[in-house]
């Protein structure tokens, strides 16, 4: 795709986003709200919490090990659902009356022994104290950044997220009180030689009260959502707009579809523009490299683009469970780099430390900061301060690359 994308005079790419009331996103937020509660009591808690939901029911399951404090899980679940907006049976789900089942047990000691004491520590090969912490699992993680938007994200996913955030704002502030929590957006961007030039298609599906006409919903969402979030220069007479194309979206949330933590990993990351290692984020403490290393790779990628080393970059890092040092690190700049890729890779290795313990330290990840990432995307956020979105290694990278 990269060569076609960069060399084609006309190329289309589509990304989607979903609202906080989407059943899968509900589950992500519940899992991360529970994670935050455990980290508030014990910053070194080991947490792997999954959530499932269907009509009238939420199930929380997983593995947790922590030192102290009572965690009122059912209360956290109901509060999270209420904050999302499911406060009445009219919406198909009610935070106060839904069933909540909890099935949580301790982390496997076989896993814990590899995280508590890395292989480097066991064989006496530690370079420093950071190598006492092993990766919580094997796997590969990716990070990406590009210069298409101010937040250094692909235009299609950035716009899809903006539409959803605006949709949630007008629902909650009373501008469009008939809207309900479940919604999805989708944006197709037209590119010319790797640069976004216009929006070809906008799709929004939003749950709504039963007495609102399709014509009113369409007019309101175009005026209060689409026109406020998509640059005017990118909309033209040929832009196609679809609003609730089925004609009706009254039944939504868990009543319309079951939900599960970790089923929106492309929404959470780069909208399909970059590759994905397959591991979900929500409900996992930072010892799980599925989450922490993906955050670190985004941090590295964003600093590379901000430093002017490349206009577009993707990184891959890989780990073995119980081993501190990454197994591999690669950089791909798709022909957009100011210096050779091997120079960028060398600079990254000089400036960034991608061992799990160092990632946790440098990004200060043992804090209750995760619930707010669980809807609206984990990357490119301009509404919240996330450590992996900071471009605080730009000058170091430029020096290391000889610029």
From Swiss-Prot:
Assigned protein family: Belongs to the AdoMet synthase family.
GO CC annotations on file: cytosol
Keyword ATP-binding belongs to the record: yes
Annotated organism of origin: Chloroflexus aurantiacus (strain ATCC 29366 / DSM 635 / J-10-fl)
Cofactor note as given: Binds 2 divalent ions per subunit. Binds 1 potassium ion per subunit.
Superkingdom, natural source: Bacteria
Classification via CDD domains: S-AdoMet_synt
Entry EC number(s): 2.5.1.6
Residues that, per the record, bind L-methionine: 63, 107, 257, 288
Pathway: Amino-acid biosynthesis; S-adenosyl-L-methionine biosynthesis; S-adenosyl-L-methionine from L-methionine: step 1/1
Metal-binding found in the keyword field: yes
Cofactor: Mg(2+); K(+)
Family matches, as Gene3D superfamilies: 3.30.300.10
Entry binding sites for K(+): 50
Enzyme class, broadest EC rank: transferase
Keywords annotated in UniProt: ATP-binding, Cytoplasm, Magnesium, Metal-binding, Nucleotide-binding, One-carbon metabolism, Potassium, Transferase
Residues annotated as binding ATP: 22, 182-184, 248-249, 257, 263-264, 280, 284
Listed SUPFAM superfamilies: S-adenosylmethionine synthetase
Gene: metK
Catalytic activity field: L-methionine + ATP + H2O = S-adenosyl-L-methionine + phosphate + diphosphate
The name this protein goes by in its record: S-adenosylmethionine synthase
């Amino acid at each position: 795709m990269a060569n076609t994308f960069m060399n084609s005079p006309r190329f289309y790419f589509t990304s989607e986003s979903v609202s906080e009331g989407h059943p899968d996103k509900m589950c992500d937020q519940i899992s991360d709200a529970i994670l935050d509660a455990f980290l508030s009591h014990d910053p070194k808690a080991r947490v792997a919490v999954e959530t499932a939901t269907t009509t009238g029911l939420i199930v929380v399951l997983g593995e947790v090990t922590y030192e102290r404090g009572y965690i009122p899980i059912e209360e956290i679940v109901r509060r999270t659902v209420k904050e999302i907006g499911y406060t009445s049976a009219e919406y198909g789900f009610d935070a106060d009356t839904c069933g909540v089942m909890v099935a949580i047990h301790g982390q496997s000691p076989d896993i814990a022994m590899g995280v508590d004491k890395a292989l480097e520590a066991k064989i006496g090969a530690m370079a420093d104290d950071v190598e006492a912490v092993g990766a919580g699992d094997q796997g590969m993680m990716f990070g990406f950044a590009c210069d298409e938007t101010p937040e250094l994200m692909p235009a299609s996913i950035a716009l899809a997220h903006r539409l959803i955030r605006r949709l949630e704002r007008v629902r909650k502030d009373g501008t469009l009180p008939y809207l309900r929590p479940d919604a999805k957006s989708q944006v197709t961007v037209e590119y010319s030689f790797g640069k976004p030039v216009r929006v070809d298609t906008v799709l929004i599906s939003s749950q709504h009260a039963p007495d609102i006409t399709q014509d009113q919903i369409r007019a309101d969402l175009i005026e209060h959502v689409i026109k406020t979030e998509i640059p005017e220069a990118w909309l033209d007479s040929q832009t196609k707009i679809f609003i609730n194309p089925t004609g009706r979206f009254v039944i939504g949330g868990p009543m319309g579809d079951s939900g599960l933590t970790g089923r929106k990993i492309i929404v959470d990351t780069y909208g399909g523009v970059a590759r994905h290692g397959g591991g979900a984020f929500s409900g996992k403490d930072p010892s799980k490299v599925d989450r922490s290393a993906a955050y670190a790779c985004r941090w590295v990628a964003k600093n590379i683009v901000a430093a002017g080393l490349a206009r577009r970059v993707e990184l891959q890092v890989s780990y073995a469970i119980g081993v501190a040092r990454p197994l591999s690190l690669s950089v791909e700049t798709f022909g957009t780099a100011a210096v050779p890729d091997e120079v960028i890779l060398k600079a990254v290795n000089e400036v960034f430390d991608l061992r799990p313990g160092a990632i946790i330290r440098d990004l200060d990840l043992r804090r209750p900061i995760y619930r707010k990432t669980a809807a609206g995307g984990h990357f490119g956020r301009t509404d919240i301060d996330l450590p992996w979105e900071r471009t605080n290694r730009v000058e170091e990278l430029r020096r290391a690359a000889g610029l």
